[in-house]
Amino acid sequence: MLFRSVVFEDYNDMSARIDRDDLDVDANSVLVLKNAGPLGGPGFPEWGMLPMPKKLIKQGVKDMVRISDGRMSGTSYGTCILHVAPEAYVGGPLALVKTGDLIELDAEKKLLNLKISAEELEKRKKAWKRPPLKYERSYGAIFSRHVKQANEGCDFDFLEGTAPTSDPEIH
């Protein structure tokens, strides 16, 4: 299926616009929340459960596709693609998505594609600029410089060992 994307640059952008009457969204849109991952949040907050726009709820829409580099509680519901990694904050795939882009989703084939030309994709990659780190000192600075991405466990890189860790004995 093809979905037209409605992109939110971060949680504050989403919070400010999700229920506006002029939000260009319909039941066949996909909501995309960027910069909600380990660094973008920061801290990998549970922002992946994007709320349904009120104007769609009033129309009887109960679910829609939502994509984020964030996470959500296990008690949440709906059609969500989460933990997209690398996250947008470090230039991952969501960093290049813009409102109006078509996104192809086929769950059975495990397929998620941004339907733009290779030339446009390359142009966006070249234009992308990494945001500055949110912290310059203290724990926030250590976190920002050393946390790994979601697909790598969000651990600190300096805590990696050189040998595999065996599973604990269970009695």
List the model feature ranges, each with a label:
Residues 1-2:
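Short, small-residue-biased leader/transition segments that mark boundaries at the very start
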Residues 10-18:
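Phosphate-interacting basic helix/loop segments used at nucleotide- and nucleic-acid interfaces
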Residues 17-30:
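Glycine-rich phosphate/diphosphate-binding loops that line cofactor/substrate pockets in enzymes
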Residues 28-45, 58-62, 75-77, 93:
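Conserved structured catalytic cores and adjacent interaction surfaces
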Residues 46-52:
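Charged helix-capping and loop-helix junction motifs
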Residues 55, 59-116:
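Phosphate/diphosphate-binding loops
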Residues 91-92, 96-171:
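Intein/HINT protein-splicing elements and their conserved insertion hotspots or analogous self-processing inserts
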